[in-house]
């Protein structure tokens, strides 16, 4: 694989206001403390750390209808979009360490500024495609995709803090994997727009090999293009990632998570990656936190070439005789 698929720019995004539970802003810290950067370097990656974004507190951030913390969420994603665009212009794969999944508005927007033809693979128990009008919780981490989709332009009210957002992907540019907790309004949007998805039912029926074959053929079949993988750790079963805000039983296994990421790496087209919703405050025990963090690290390493079959550099003296 080319050196390009191992050239990474890391952005920490310690932000939690897209959802109600404290602790997810510690995600970047615990992923770094687990040795993520060192491990990436050990597997021959060229890693540049852009540090953690400084998110200022926005006072008087009153709700918009029932949408909570709109200005804080909008501003955080605006900052992240600028930083991701910078990383992409520097020729690196952007690796965003979240933080809650509302940040994908910024991550994908920034990526699309440099690569407008990107395709998105969204691994999650949830579709995160509620609009500010269909949401029942008001939490923006359940709404990022609705802000990004061109087909929903005109269906999204003018939420304070979001005037900078321009929808940048079409319904045909995204594939979901791992769905198992989808609101009725979200299901209506999926079906109406004809969005490609593999719920856990499809994963069970087809197997993860077929799911990835179909996903990559759907996104890359007509033309090779950059891939943005937005990975919510709650896409995996809570037995592997318990320390997260909205766990749902019956998720992807550790092995299925690794298979998804190994296959994406093998395309050589991974261009942006989000690792979202690791919340160390929500582990019932220290071991649950460690398990969640270690799983998130393993998923990340597989995105950049770590293979379960093993890896090696050229070993000249073992070359077969001519």
Curated annotation (Swiss-Prot):
Q: Which residues carry this modification: Phosphoserine?
A: 62, 72, 163, 217
Q: What are the entry keywords?
A: Adaptive immunity, Arginine metabolism, Cytoplasm, Disease variant, Hydrolase, Immunity, Innate immunity, Manganese, Metal-binding, Phosphoprotein, Urea cycle
**Superkingdom, according to UniProt?**
Eukaryota
Where does it live in the cell?
Cytoplasm; Cytoplasmic granule
Q: Which residues bind substrate?
A: 126-130, 137-139, 183, 246, 277
Q: This chain belongs to which protein, by name?
A: Arginase-1
Residues annotated to bind Mn(2+) 2: 124, 126, 232, 234
